[in-house]
């Protein structure tokens, strides 16, 4: 079992690196059709593909521009979600963040705390000037969560994402290190 990363512990959760023991859970989450709209997946992912993803996640964020973490509930060490930091560009000092919370653990503050910890890490350790998130228009829960964390809705890409016989607008939310 992986150990929490120093500085990645909140009141409800801690964040830790992905490990081989996470393969069944990540395979289940990545193949949940309810999550496909948010993450852009259009087909099931194999265990081999997820295995490669886990192996690649050990590389440094400066090398890959991304970092994937498991969200664990404090006390129980139960994995409740997956946090991804991506599109890290040191020259522009910005980073994107995305979160997936297991359906049994939503609306309990885990996603909000994970985004908060990731934002603090981006500002304090990576010296980012901004953190941003992409949210589809239908996802009002994520929009509210980001707004409550100080993110601002700064852009809309109309009819950006095709899903289930319709287009969805894509919203950009940004938070600056001020």
Task: Indicate where each model-derived feature is located.
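Sparse recognition of residues in long alpha-helices and their boundaries
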Residues: 42-43, 66, 162
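Conserved GNAT-fold acetyl-CoA-binding loop/helix
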Residues: 34-56
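Acyl-donor (CoA/ACP) binding surface of acyl/acetyltransferases
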Residues: 1-24, 30-32, 72-178
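A general structural signal marking secondary-structure boundaries and capping sites
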Residues: 33-34, 61
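A short helix-loop-beta-strand connector motif used in the catalytic cores of GNAT acetyltransferases and
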Residues: 57-70
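A generic secondary-structure signal
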Residues: 56-57, 121
